[in-house]
Amino acid sequence: MSFLVAIVGRANVGKSTLFNVLTNSHDALVFDFEGVTRDRQYGQAKYDDLDYLVVDTGGISDKDVGFDEFMAKQSQIAIDEANLVFFVVDGRSGLTTGDEYVASLLRQKDKKVVVVVNKVDGTDEEAAMAEFYSFGFDKVFAISAAHRRNTQKLVDKFLKKPLNEYYQDYTQTQEHKEQQRHGIHFSLIGRPNVGKSTLTNRMLGEDRVVVFDMPGTTIDSVSIPFERHGQKYTIVDTAGVRKRGKVKQTLEKFSVIKTLQAIQDSNVVVAVVDARQGISDQDLSLIHFAIKNGRALVLAVNKWDGMTEEDRIQVKQDLKRKLFFLQDYVDIHFISALHGTNVGHVFESIDTAYACANKKITTADATRLMQLAVEAHSPPMVGKFRIKLKYAHVGGHNPPVIVIHGNQVSRLPNSYKRYLENFFREALDFRGTPIVFEFKQSENPFADRKNKRSKDEGSKSKKVK
C-alpha cells in the first residue's frame, strides 16, 4: 500500500498544477468525469525510488450542495486516507473565507498538514506567507507551481522524512503480513455493478457480500480468506470505480483510493468488465495501473449469458482493439458470475499467473535465454558499434525482474526491448504476469588501469622534455 499525499484547497489555487509537477502529468491516472474543476485525479509519483500516490481532490467550498456536496465528501475521504496533506492557497489573492473553511475542516483531522502558498512569483515570499500562519498549522511554505519554483524544496523538506519513515514501518508490517498471508491474495477490481460482489459470492459458494442491483452497494473493500481444492486464497472485493456524472446518492462511497491500494497489496488482480457496457476508460486506467505496479492480471468479462452471437462477436472485437497490449499474455474469460459459467477457469488463470509471477529463474538460465535471443536477432548498430548484451540475472519476482548488463544499453530501442520480453515470455511460458527488464551499463574493469597508464605516460613525457 502506497504512501498517500492529498492536495486540497478551494478552487483555482493551483492544485492541479502542483499535482502535475509531482506526478509528471503524463503518469496521471485520470478518470474521464464531467467537469474539469470537479475531477479528482490520481497519480503515481516517485521520490528517491520510493513510490507514492497523489490525489488532487478538486475544490472544496462551504456552499457545496447536491453533486458538489458529494464531491466535498469524497475530498474528505481522501483526506482521511492521506498520510500527508498539502493545503494549497493563493499567495496573490491572500487569505479568503474559502481558505478559512478548508482550514477548519483540516483542523478537525489528526493529519500532517503543510500550507502551500502558491503563486508567489514576483512577490515577497515571507510577506505572502505571513497571514496564513493564522490557520494554526506550523508548516507553511511558498512555491510557484507553474514555474516549478521551490517545488523540489517542498518535497525535500516535507515529504522525504515521513515517506522514509512510512516505508520503514511498512516494510516490517508487510514482511509480517507475508508470513501471515492466507495463500494467494487477489483482488476483484472494476466499475460498480459489473458483478464483482456476485463473482465474490460465486467463488466463495456463499452470500458473504451484500449484493443489490444498484451501483455501489459494496460500501468498502471486503477481505475474505477461503480455501478451494486445497489451495488457500484471500479475495478482496473493492468498492467499484464509477463514472462521476452518474453519481446521484451521497451515501455511495466512491473509493478509487481503496481500489488502487488493493491493487498494490494483491498478488493477482482480476479485472471485471461488464460485457454489455463494454470496456471503458476507467477500466483501462485501472488495468494500466495494475500493470505499472507489476501485478499479475486476469480479465473476467461478466454477464456473457443472454447475449446474442452478434453482440458477442462485437464485444470480442472491441476487447481486441482496446486491449491489444494484453493479447500476448493475459487470459480473458467470458463468464456469468450469476450462473457460475467459466468461473472455474478464472481460478485456473489466477493460479497460473501467481505461479509465473513467482517462478524462480537462475542466473545461468537468464543469461542463456538472453544469448539465444541475441543469436536469433542481434541488437542494432549504434554508429560504428553494435550494442552488446553480456549477461543477465534475476533482480526479483512478483513481478519477475530480469537485469541485463552490457555496453550502450541506454541506446537500446523499445522495439528490441519488446522483442526480448516476448522471447523470454515464450521460452519461460509466462502467463498473466508482466516481465520487468532493467538494463545496466557494464563497468570497464580496465578503466582505472587505463587512466593510471595515461597519467604515467604524461609524467614520463614531461620528464623527457
From Swiss-Prot:
Keyword Repeat: yes
Residue ranges of every copy of the KH-like domain listed in the record: 359-443
Residues where GTP 1 binds: 9-16, 56-60, 118-121
A GO BP annotation: ribosome biogenesis
Residue segments, region Disordered: 446-465
A Pfam short name: KH_dom-like
Superkingdom: Bacteria
The keyword Repeat is annotated on this UniProt entry: yes
Domain EngA-type G, residue spans: 3-166, 184-358
Keyword annotations from UniProtKB, A to Z: GTP-binding, Nucleotide-binding, Repeat, Ribosome biogenesis
Molecular functions per Gene Ontology: GTP binding; ribosome binding
Function: GTPase that plays an essential role in the late steps of ribosome biogenesis.
Subunit (UniProt): Associates with the 50S ribosomal subunit.
Assigned protein family: Belongs to the TRAFAC class TrmE-Era-EngA-EngB-Septin-like GTPase superfamily. EngA (Der) GTPase family.
Protein name: GTPase Der
